Amino acid sequence: MSLNVDNVKEVLVKIAEVVNENKEELSQLDAAIGDGDHGHNMSRGFLKVVEELKNNSYDDIGSIFKKVGMVLVSNVGGASGPLYGTAFLKAATFVNNKKEIDINDFSVCLQQAVDGIKIRGKANVGDKTMLDVLQPVSDLIKDLINQKYLAKEILNKAVELAFQKVEFTKEIVAKKGRASYLGQRSIGYKDPGAYSSYLILKCISENI
């Protein structure tokens, strides 16, 4: 697995398409335990990302991630914009000036993103957030790299785990965001941020 600047841009366009296609479902999930706007906010933000990618040229992947992060922070409402934006901005610091990335780079970027989300959101695994997907997936990817699995196998297994972890969020009480106001009543519902994280990981796996 090796992605250059153009490959990364293509994957981001695909992510925007997937988010847009699933915006109603994401917002419906959010309506059950939040503000009901997660899908539409995410769609708006990623469509703006596509617009920026088409209207500008980039010499390296770090510059792309930095732009994506800034666009998401500026254009996605609620908690999602700052969190997803922070994820890309943190990843950008690692791939700064890189023109190609491989599975090892992706693994570091993902953990950088997770660390940024933890700090920005003051959250951790078990709080019923996107971290319930992203941290276990990051840990799995690192483990499979050490076991010398091929990149495609790693990503396939990561997506399987991500799906399981989305389902797991139905079983726990929300401790962050508007959903936390519901207390025990938040049990039984998927976390929309966890689900959008799964969709993005699945899209990445299918398009590289």
Swiss-Prot record:
<dbReference type="InterPro" id="IPR012737">
    <property type="entry name" value="DhaK_L_YcgS"/>
</dbReference>
<keyword id="KW-0418">Kinase</keyword>
<dbReference type="InterPro" id="IPR050861">
    <property type="entry name" value="Dihydroxyacetone_Kinase"/>
</dbReference>
<protein>
    <recommendedName>
        <fullName>Putative kinase MCAP_0235</fullName>
        <ecNumber>2.7.-.-</ecNumber>
    </recommendedName>
</protein>
<dbReference type="GO" id="GO:0005829">
    <property type="term" value="C:cytosol"/>
</dbReference>
<keyword id="KW-0808">Transferase</keyword>
<dbReference type="GO" id="GO:0004371">
    <property type="term" value="F:glycerone kinase activity"/>
</dbReference>
<feature type="domain" description="DhaL">
    <location>
        <begin position="6"/>
        <end position="206"/>
    </location>
</feature>
<dbReference type="GO" id="GO:0019563">
    <property type="term" value="P:glycerol catabolic process"/>
</dbReference>
<dbReference type="InterPro" id="IPR004007">
    <property type="entry name" value="DhaL_dom"/>
</dbReference>
<dbReference type="Pfam" id="PF02734">
    <property type="entry name" value="Dak2"/>
</dbReference>
<dbReference type="InterPro" id="IPR036117">
    <property type="entry name" value="DhaL_dom_sf"/>
</dbReference>
